[in-house]
Amino acid sequence: MSQRRISVIAPCRNERAHVVAFCDAVAAQELPEGVALEVLVADGMSDDGTRDLLAQRCAADPRFAMIDNPRRIVSSGLNRCIERARGEVIVRMDLHTRYESDYIVECLAALDRTGAANVGGPWRAEGEGATQEAVAAAFQSRWVTGGARSR
């Protein structure tokens, strides 16, 4: 029986405060039997210790790989990850986001159920401090999002 390979791709730059929790959350994803996971993190040449933490994770868990993103632009990092991805499905994730342990399996189920080319789940913006909380509230506003069902 062949394995279904899933590629998680994530861009980052100077995410020391979030990188360990993100990696732990991805590593803890509940995957169906026969699903192999690779995690490609495109680092925008971080100078805050993020690269060291990513290197440690990559050394400890062969599913993880750090990809250099010298342009330091999110889209460039995503493109570099996509070039390296070996999965039949690509799951785009972010280091600032908290994921339920069934996030990937629910995305796979939605793909299989609908035949869609792209799926995602609802999300809720949260912030720390007045400015971030105001931005989070705006993201949740129907006026700002135009009533997008994903929010």
Residue spans of the language-model regions?
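Cell-envelope/extracellular polymer assembly enzymes that use nucleotide-activated donors
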Residues: 5-7, 38
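Conserved donor NDP-sugar-binding/catalytic core segment of glycosyltransferases
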Residues: 98, 102-133, 137
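Short aromatic/hydrophobic "clamp" motif used to bind/position activated sugar donors
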Residues: 90
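A conserved acidic beta->alpha catalytic loop
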Residues: 25, 43-52, 94-100
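Short beta-strand/loop segment that forms part of the nucleotide-sugar
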Residues: 35-45, 67-70
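Acidic helix N-cap motif at the loop->helix transition within catalytic regions
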Residues: 17-20, 48-56, 102
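Glycine-rich, basic loop-to-helix element that forms the pyrophosphate-binding segment
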Residues: 69-85, 106
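Short, acidic, metal-binding catalytic loop of nucleotide-sugar glycosyltransferases
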Residues: 24-35
